[in-house]
């Protein structure tokens, strides 16, 4: 029978109280390392801002030549509902240029930098082979930044944008993303002024019945279509319902 290792012998000789403390220390260290690894995975420490998800099949005739730009929420494009929403659009035949908002806004951006990110993403999508027009989709924090950027979209790009889809946008803007918004701090400005100025294309605004700080109920312009889903800001985490609603908006053309 093999003899116990030095570490095993030492643990056996350690009083139970100290042994428990040592085990708890190891468990705490494992939790910290796990949390750091998770934050790295979702993109808080850096990584690609853009990810292209090709269409999984041929697009329906009406959507041919159209790509989607998708801005994730503040938990990034690799977790939560975002990956399901992105893949659902691609599975229906539309390529998606996904933006990891957590990575893009991990450091506070100026309003002008936020605007330029939306412009750059639009141009990137339009430069993809075969793409002639784009649909712009934002989720939560991504919806906030999207509407702010679209409000001042250059005139040269406007004719090539089919519509804007805002999923659970808030009534305030913060130009910095932290996981789940826990470290965001106070809002930088109200969301309504920029959102109200988007009067040149169709806008679909999706919100939950129990949301308390939603932008959607504040929008009454003729070009805005509001859609209400069950739940609060997280919509009961029902990615299938939200992805179906987004695709219905895409098929409607606004």
Language-model region placement:
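Catalytic nucleophile serine of serine hydrolases
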Residues: 139-141, 168
């Amino acid at each position: 029978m093999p003899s116990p290792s030095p570490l095993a012998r030492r643990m056996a000789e350690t009083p139970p109280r100290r042994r428990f403390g040592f085990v708890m220390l190891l468990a705490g260290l494992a939790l910290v390392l796990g949390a750091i690894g998770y934050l790295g995975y979702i993109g808080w420490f850096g990584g690609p801002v853009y990810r292209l998800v090709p269409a999984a099949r041929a697009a329906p005739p009406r959507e041919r030549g159209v790509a989607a730009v998708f801005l994730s929420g503040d938990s990034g494009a690799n977790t939560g509902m975002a990956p399901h929403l992105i893949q659902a659009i691609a599975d229906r035949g539309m390529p998606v240029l996904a933006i990891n908002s957590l990575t893009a806004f991990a450091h506070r951006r100026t309003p002008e930098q936020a605007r330029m990110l939306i412009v750059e993403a639009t141009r990137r999508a339009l430069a993809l082979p075969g793409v002639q027009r784009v649909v712009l989709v934002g989720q939560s924090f991504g919806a906030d930044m999207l509407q702010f950027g679209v409000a001042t979209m250059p005139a040269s790009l406007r004719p090539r944008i089919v519509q804007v889809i805002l999923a659970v946008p808030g009534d305030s803007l913060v130009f910095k993303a932290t996981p789940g918004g826990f470290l965001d701090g106070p809002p930088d400005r109200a969301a309504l002024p920029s959102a109200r100025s988007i009067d040149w294309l169709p806008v679909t605004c999706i919100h939950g019945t129990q949301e308390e700080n939603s932008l959607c109920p504040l929008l009454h312009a003729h070009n805005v279509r509001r859609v209400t889903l069950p739940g609060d800001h997280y919509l009961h985490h029902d990615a299938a319902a939200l992805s179906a609603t987004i695709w219905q908006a895409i098929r409607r053309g606004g």
